[in-house]
């Protein structure tokens, strides 16, 4: 079978990537198979069923077409793509295959953000959407995310149904793809300009007027899709006191100026800090390549730098949304089960309804979809730097958050305060939670087995005490059971099943889960206790070095 793949190397679109891989990496592509999971498909470029190339993408596209036409008479699909290698090529392949089966397609004529895609599906009343992106993964990755008619990523059940349509097609080199006629070519349309115009109006309505202040902002797109949309939105709101990190705000599929195009990574802000020091800026904001997540850094008058983690940003944004929506009845917010305790405590402090969902923003979108008319969504977030303030988008949306955060900081600046001061006030009122994420990477087939072994061992040897902290409850989302060790009671977890274990102490919790999009296993620690860093490290060592 390797020879069959070598025969099509020139037309695979991934020749350069394949030739730069080690023999082990090349073999892994031939020995594995990409699967369409709950977060779509994400993988490296290369040859074989386990890699992204012209043929595996075509297989996904054809399976997706069959999935749509099995239940919809005249489907309409929106396709967007980011600034990664082969994103426009993959988008065009998918558009051509869908059109060849008489499916109407709106195809972006340049790179677009993930929030743009979610909004466009809703605005155009499409049946589905496709986003070509691998978020913040390294440059040799890409992916395909699929959205439903509500602008949210497919549910677990719909993802499984789509997966069966893809799998039944067999080997990607043996698939007979339908040809695209001239008439069918006319089914592929550009995305109308009024889609983005209406998106801008929604953001403007959310943010309102940004007050006059001395606030200066530095912004970086980390070579992704958020420029020019962010500068355009800020200008439309009459806020012009920002500077772009020029070296990082041009599309670059290699993400040349950063080791990781991930706003969670402090080093991703190094060039932003240099510019901030030069122009005496107060607030630094960066988005990931597809602009669904963002990070912030704050700089005081003496040039001191303050980094904020996803839970702290989430608490700040929730605090601001609570202020913005004061007097609104039946307010509700959502966060993922691995997000920290600060936002939950803040919601309870202000009598805002609160609910936890599984990791993955589609679960927050599902909760929004099922809200009653009397309930008012004000905020949703995940600790991995994904936030949503108003649900005209049904995925995390950094673009709507950027001007909202700037407005918040501008108001504080006029009071002689910083976000840091606001966060200190929050923790004084509701308690301080320290959060730390340990992320361990295990590549390849052996790495996947290693991750499975760690989860299996942790399940079988779940402790009653860790580093002096008494375990009071254990939630195993794979079995769907919660064990209360204080009352010796077992109850059902009402959320869908997932490969997550969460252990509670009086001081907070830890959670362990494999990543759904990367070859990683993640340990989340959220505790209100002394010597947090030491305890968190000991817990990590006990799990991964035992």
Curated annotation (Swiss-Prot):
Binds 1 Mg(2+) ion per subunit. Mg(2+) binds at residues 135, 288, 290, 292. It is an enzyme of class 5 (isomerase). GO terms for biological process: enterobacterial common antigen biosynthetic process; glucose metabolic process; purine ribonucleoside salvage. This is Phosphoglucomutase. Catalyzes the interconversion between glucose-6-phosphate and alpha-glucose-1-phosphate. This is the first step in the biosynthesis of diglucosyl-diacylglycerol (Glc2-DAG), i.e. a glycolipid found in the membrane, which is also used as a membrane anchor for lipoteichoic acid (LTA). SUPFAM superfamilies: Phosphoglucomutase, C-terminal domain, Phosphoglucomutase, first 3 domains. The keyword Metal-binding applies. It holds the Pfam family PGM_PMM_I. Gene3D superfamilies: Alpha-D-Glucose-1,6-Bisphosphate, subunit A, domain 3 (3.40.120.10), Alpha-D-phosphohexomutase, C-terminal domain (3.30.310.50). The active site is at 135 (phosphoserine intermediate). It catalyses: alpha-D-glucose 1-phosphate = alpha-D-glucose 6-phosphate. Pathway: Glycolipid metabolism; diglucosyl-diacylglycerol biosynthesis. Its cofactor is Mg(2+). GO terms for molecular function: magnesium ion binding; phosphoglucomutase activity; phosphopentomutase activity. PROSITE patterns: PGM_PMM. Belongs to the phosphohexose mutase family. Keywords: Carbohydrate metabolism, Glucose metabolism, Isomerase, Magnesium, Metal-binding, Phosphoprotein. It comes from Staphylococcus epidermidis (strain ATCC 12228 / FDA PCI 1200). Its EC number is 5.4.2.2.
């Amino acid at each position: 079978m390797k020879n069959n793949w070598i025969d099509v190397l020139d037309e695979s679109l991934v020749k350069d990537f394949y030739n730069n891989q080690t023999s082990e990496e090349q073999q892994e592509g031939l020995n594995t198979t990409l699967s369409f999971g709950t977060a779509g498909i994400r993988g490296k470029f290369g040859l074989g069923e386990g890699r992204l190339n012209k043929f595996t993408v075509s297989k996904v596209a054809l399976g997706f077409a069959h999935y749509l036409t099995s239940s919809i008479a005249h489907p309409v699909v929106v396709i967007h793509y980011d600034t990664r290698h082969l994103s426009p090529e993959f988008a065009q392949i998918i558009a051509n295959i869908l059109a060849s089966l008489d499916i109407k397609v709106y195809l972006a004529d340049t790179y677009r953000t993930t929030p743009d895609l979610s909004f466009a599906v809703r605005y155009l009343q499409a049946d589905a959407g496709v986003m070509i992106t691998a978020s913040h993964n390294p440059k040799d990755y890409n992916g395909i995310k699929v959205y439903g008619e509500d602008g949210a990523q497919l549910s677990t059940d719909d993802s499984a149904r789509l997966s069966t349509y893809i799998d039944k097609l067999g080997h990607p080199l043996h698939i007979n793809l339908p040809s695209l006629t001239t008439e069918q070519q006319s089914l592929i349309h550009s995305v109308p300009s009024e889609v983005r115009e209406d998106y801008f109006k929604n953001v403007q309505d959310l943010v309102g007027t940004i007050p006059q202040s001395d606030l200066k902002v530095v912004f970086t797109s980390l070579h992704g899709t958020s420029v020019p949309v962010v500068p355009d939105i800020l200008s439309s709101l009459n806020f012009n006191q920002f500077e772009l990190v020029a070296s990082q705000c041009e599309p670059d599929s290699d993400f040349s100026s950063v080791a990781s195009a991930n706003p969670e990574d402090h080093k991703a802000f190094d060039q932003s800090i240099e510019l901030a020091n030069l122009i005496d800026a107060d607030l630094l904001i960066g988005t990931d390549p597809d602009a669904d997540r963002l990070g912030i850094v704050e700089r005081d008058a003496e040039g001191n730098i303050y980094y904020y983690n996803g839970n702290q940003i989430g608490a700040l944004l929730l605090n601001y949304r609570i202020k913005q929506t004061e007097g609104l009845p039946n307010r509700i917010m959502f966060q993922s089960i691995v997000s920290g305790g600060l936002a939950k405590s803040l919601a309870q402090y202000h009598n805002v309804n609160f609910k936890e969902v599984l990791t993955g923003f589609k679960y927050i979108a599902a909760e929004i979809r099922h809200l009653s008319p009397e309930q008012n969504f004000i905020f949703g977030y995940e600790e991995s730097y994904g936030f949503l303030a108003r649900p005209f988008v049904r995925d995390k949306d950094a673009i709507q958050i950027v001007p909202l955060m700037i407005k918040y900081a501008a108001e504080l600046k006029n009071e002689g305060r910083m976000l840091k001061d606001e966060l200190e006030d929050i923790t004084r009122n509701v308690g301080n939670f320290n959060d730390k994420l340990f992320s361990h990477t295990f590549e390849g087939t052996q790495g996947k087995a290693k991750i499975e072994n760690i989860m299996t061992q942790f399940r079988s040897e779940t402790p009653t005490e860790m580093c002096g902290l008494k375990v009071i409850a254990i939630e195993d989302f794979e079995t769907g059971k919660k064990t209360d060790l204080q009352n010796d009671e077992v109850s059902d977890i009402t959320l869908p099943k997932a490969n997550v274990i969460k252990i509670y102490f009086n001081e907070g919790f830890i959670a362990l889960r494999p990543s759904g999009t990367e070859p990683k296993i993640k340990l989340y620690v959220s505790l209100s206790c002394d010597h947090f860093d030491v305890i968190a490290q000991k817990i990590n060592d006990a799990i991964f070095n035992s």
